Amino acid sequence: MTESATSLREQKRWETSHRISMCAQRLTDVHGLDGFTMDDLADAAEVSRRTLFNYFPSKLDAVLGTIPELPPAAKAAFHDGGPHGSLIEDLGALAKALLAVKEPDRETMMLTRRVLVGSDRVLAAAHQRFEQLTDDFAALILEREGDDFPVEHARLAVRIIGALFDSALSTFLEGGDRPLDELFDLYLNQARSLFT
């Protein structure tokens, strides 16, 4: 199979996954997590039950959606000590590369945040997913920095990036015309000035 055919198939898979997730979030926003069935979700997303279950095993998984894969070039650059040569800045670049795979719009991010704060179960599941993502990113740091780098430092670095992203996201959701990645850079620079 050609690379373009593979990327087209991956693009279609991502679009279907995203559509299902957005429908799950809208249904959760309106009816609560227990207020709709997987059949309702399949109908709303215009997919068969079989397709729905091929993408997500549960409503909760559908609401949380799929975490996009890191672009291989960004992952390789990070592993090799780049793109900036500073762990925190390089982690920031990695996080922005992950976000850029399918950068959501303000309305989508507002819906996601409403759903998260509106349901303790969704929030707890999102926290578990963040912990897994923290472990994954910490593993990338340890691969890059070597065995002598403390795992606690790797996890702390990821959590710092998460806090900066959350601050940027809050500002982004308040409105204005600055894109999320610019706001992230702004908060990264502010954090750097606090620590120097």
Where are these regions (language model features)?
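Short amphipathic alpha-helical segment with a characteristic S/N-K-E followed by hydrophobic residues
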Residues: 58-63, 73
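Amphipathic alpha-helical packing segments from all-alpha helical-bundle domains
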Residues: 120-145, 152-159, 167
